[in-house]
Amino acid sequence: MGFIEPPRRIPWWLRIGLWAAKRATGRDLLIGRLLAWAPKAALSSGLMEALVEHGHGALDARLLQLVRMQVSYAAACPFCVDMNGAGHANQGITDDEIEVLRGIRPAEAVASLTPRERLAIGYARKLTDTPLRFAPADVDVLKPHFTEHEIVVLATTAAQVNYWTRLIQALGVPPAGFSDPA
């Protein structure tokens, strides 16, 4: 359980969202039930999650999963590491690459990471640092490798995971077992 209990009564329209989340994830997510205390926050969180891009053109699912995992590790969120790391082998993410995401190994030392993946990981890490410090040069380094659309998708993906990491940790939501062996 988290730091607080979910409400006993959840509006019917939020129960539909909880059902959809359970169908998509295979888990009855505590965070969704806790958000029922603030229905507008639950609705906006669900919309954000539903509308975020999970792969588009050259920003494939592997690259975006690397970004999600990087933010999860950088924010030290056990739930997020569990959820965003689940199925990493299906995307070809190796143990060496996970060491990069965990900050154990420099990205340049892992040949399997492409230059774009290295840049995206670095950008995600910078988006998770506190305090945030961005200069035009931080985005200028991305421009030769990513389109404007792709830069926005990278930024919104990292921001989305940052949102969830802070919310989940603030409410004490434990890992949900996404990475547990079947």
What name fits each language-model region?
Residues 1-59, 63:
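Mobile cap/lid helix-loop segments that border enzyme active or cofactor-binding sites
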Residues 67-87:
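Short, thiol/selenol-centered motifs that function as redox-active sites or metal-ligating centers
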Residues 138-141, 148-174, 179-182:
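Preference for long, well-ordered alpha-helical segments
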Residues 66-71, 101-102, 120-128, 152-165:
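Short alpha-helical scaffolding segments that buttress acidic/His motifs in well-ordered protein cores
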Residues 112-155:
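Acidic/histidine-rich alpha-helical segments that form the ligand environment
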Residues 102-115:
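Acidic/His metal-coordination segments adjacent to aromatic residues that form catalytic metal sites
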Residues 41-46, 76-80, 119, 128-136:
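Short acidic alpha-helix initiation/capping motifs at coil-to-helix transition points
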Residues 39-43, 81-100:
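Iron-sulfur (Fe-S) cluster-binding segments and ferredoxin-like electron-carrier domains
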